[in-house]
Amino acid sequence: MGRLDGKVCVITGAGGGMGREAALLFSEEGASVCAADVDLDAAEATAAQARDAFAHKVDVADEASVRAMMDATAARYDGIDVLYNNAGISPGDDASVLDTSVEAWERVQAVNTKGVFLCCKHGIPHLLARGGGSVINVASFVAILGAATSQIAYTASKGAVLSMSRELAVQFARQNVRVNALCPGPVETPLLLSIFGDDPAALERRRAHWPTGRLAKPREIVNGALFLASDESSYVTGSTFLVDGGLTAAYVTPE
């Protein structure tokens, strides 16, 4: 038996990185999956490798698009049990508050903050209709710590996701809907590797602050998401669920 047998999961940002890993792992564990992404080709590639999944094109910043994704999933599988709100962006023009444009700020907030809001707004009613479920909102360790090398819009967006998750957890606790903020540390994703590929010295500067001395593998983060999606976490809600290799615990790291 799989840990998610009989569950229906909506996963955004499923075209790559942690979203893709989640779609494959959740499907392996028995779930039926909506693999949603703004890039339909990438979503279809993920769905094709999963045991039971379908691809759906979604713009999480667009309300009609999010509503259509939830409705399509519920119609196909007769309901929804798990929301894995993973889609997010971290553009290169998001930097210091002194340099980041209002346009860049708004673009990040639209996807990272508004996107999670819309997925919860239009997804939670489907969970309520099933008698409960699990919402996993992907925040970040930067919602806990500040950074001298700033991505001000991204950091603010992830702080908003963390606060939103706590409030939703309290609001829906007695209706058996659990809401948790998954806070990954730095993860070996194409996006992050491309950033460090242009500046290898930046990777080495950061490595000194990671207790493990390495980036997380996407599957290591998604294993935490699997726990939150499963009934094993039935008494876990409102949590700041850190999977960060000890980063937020560190004052100094090993020599």
Please state what every model-predicted region is.
Residues 140:
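Residue(s) in the substrate-gating loop at a strand-loop-helix junction
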Residues 125, 170-174, 234:
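Alpha-helical segment proximal to the catalytic Tyr-Lys
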Residues 3-34:
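Canonical Rossmann dinucleotide-binding motif of NAD(H)/NADP(H)-dependent dehydrogenases/reductases
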Residues 120, 157, 165:
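Active-site helix of classical SDR
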Residues 99, 150, 174, 186-210, ...:
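A glycine/serine/threonine-rich, flexible loop-to-helix segment
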Residues 94-97, 101-106, 206:
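Substrate-binding pocket helix/loop in short-chain dehydrogenase/reductase
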Residues 90, 94, 226, 237-255:
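Short C-terminal tail/terminal secondary-structure segment
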